[in-house]
Regions:
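Individual transmembrane alpha-helices with interfacial aromatic-anchor signatures
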Residues: 96-117
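Core segments of transmembrane alpha-helices
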Residues: 44-51, 111-119
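Cytosolic juxtamembrane helix and N-cap/initiation of the first transmembrane helix
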Residues: 1-16, 121-133, 138
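Membrane-helix interface segments
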Residues: 60-64
Length: 138
């Protein structure tokens, strides 16, 4: 079995679950997101990483690594800025005390860890020679 694909699968599935829960919490903290918008955003955020998983499992490591890296890096930059750097209603350090504060902080940190891990896995996948090319040379 492909170890890179296994690790990527864990990260992408965990990321999908945490993104959904995080967006539900965002909707509770800052009203404005409907249930349909949360579901649509979750689907959109996780579509490209899911395609990347299929590519990684079918031994297209470079393309799969690129498609895994791109959305996770964008999420890392935007989420890291929104939740840890820029002051605002969704910054974990400046949020008002609500019953959702601790779960929101936990999901923000989990997303940070999963996105960094996913980017690292994607870079490792991108640096490897795809299995199909290695078999063709033999």
């Amino acid at each position: 079995m492909n170890r890179t694909a296994r690790y990527a699968t864990f990260v992408v599935l965990a990321h999908a679950a945490v993104v959904f829960w995080h967006l539900v919490l965002v909707a509770k903290i800052t009203p404005g997101l409907t249930e349909h918008q949360v579901l649509a955003a979750t689907t959109a955020i996780n579509l490209v990483p899911t395609v990347a998983l299929v590519l990684l499992w079918t031994h297209f490591l470079r393309l799969g690594g690129f498609l895994l890296f791109l959305p996770l890096a964008v999420g890392l930059i935007i989420g890291g800025s929104e939740h840890f750097v820029t002051p605002g209603p969704l910054n974990v350090f400046y949020m008002a005390t609500t019953p959702w504060l601790l779960p929101f902080r936990v999901t923000a940190v989990l997303l940070l860890v999963l996105e960094v891990s996913g980017c690292w896995i994607a870079i490792q996948a991108f640096r490897r020679v795809p299995f199909l090319q290695a078999e063709a040379k033999q």
